[in-house]
Amino acid sequence: MAYQLQEINRRIQKDPVEFLAECDESYAQRVSLAADRILSNLERSPIVLLSGPSGSGKTTTAMKIAEELRRRGVNSHAVAMDNYFLTQDPKTAPRTPEGAIDYESPLCLDMELLDRHFAALARGEEILIPKFEFARQMRNDSMGLPLRLEKNEIAIFEGIHALNDDIAGRHPQAAKLYISARSNINEGSVLRFKGTWMRLTRRAVRDYSFRGTEVARTLDMWANVRRGEKLYISPFKSKADIIFDSSLPYEVPVMKHYALPILQSVPEDNERRGELLDLVKAFDHFQAIDPALVARDSLLREFIGGGSYQYH
């Protein structure tokens, strides 16, 4: 699917408030359809596995699906699989071809603990969800949170490796979702903004604003992120019961406000500056939208802040 640039700019000029509301409603309908599929699977399993590449909005989407399920009377919990990361020993950690620790590898996850927790939840037993401290790059089980599923309760586990065979393959009855910002933006038949650029922009803005990461560092990591997607995430997309497009037609016009200043600050000697310049120029095609118009519960708030959901 591709959005049309002319239509986006026309809607912004005509009535940006109405445009944003319609886009958010379309996203809400996708959430509702996902909830339908999950409920139809509840008798088979209380576990939902939600996967997708970096910058897809997995966290917000998991929380919104859980919210929709609760609205329908089914208590639900969103669980970040990032908390199941293992504390890495530099001597045994998986490595990229360049020799750095490969944080995109599924070997960084505690697969055995996840396996035990899924089985325990399905039996109605209590588990202790671990806590991974990213600032210290270590797991702290003493900060874990208890979770037990009562009858007809659901746990949504979201993470980049949720559909990996070593996870989903061991629990084939679980409902499975794959999410990504998949839609390009075209001007007629000419590509103006790639879906992968949307995800890179989301991540760059979030990392800069909330993780203290300079955009040059995000760009340096992006090549390995994309390599990890092709090796560890995309091959399992076909396992999903639902493919969920998390792109929003209004996000590029909003992101102009946040992304352009930080993208333009990247040093000229950065090896990815060529692609970066293409991305910077692409924003010129879009009318801007005031970020204040973005709803507090919008998925975009996961990346720009000021939202009604709490992110850890």
Q: What do the predicted segments below correspond to?
A:
Residues M1-D36:
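Charged, amphipathic alpha-helical linker segments immediately N-terminal to NTP-binding catalytic cores
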Residues P16-A21, A28, A162-H312:
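Conserved NTP phosphate-binding and transfer environment spanning the P-loop NTPase/kinase superfamily
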Residues V48-L50:
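Hydrophobic anchor at the beta1->P-loop junction of P-loop NTPases
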Residues K58:
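Conserved lysine of the Walker
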Residues T61-I65, A80:
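Hydrophobic positions on the alpha1 helix immediately C-terminal to the Walker A/P-loop
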Residues E67-H77:
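Post-Walker A helix-loop "phosphate-sensing" segment adjacent to the P-loop in P-loop NTPases
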Residues H77-V79, L86-R136:
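Conserved nucleotide-sensing/catalytic segment adjacent to the nucleotide-binding pocket
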Residues D115-Q173, W222-F236:
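Glycine-rich phosphate-binding loop used to anchor ATP phosphates in small-molecule kinases
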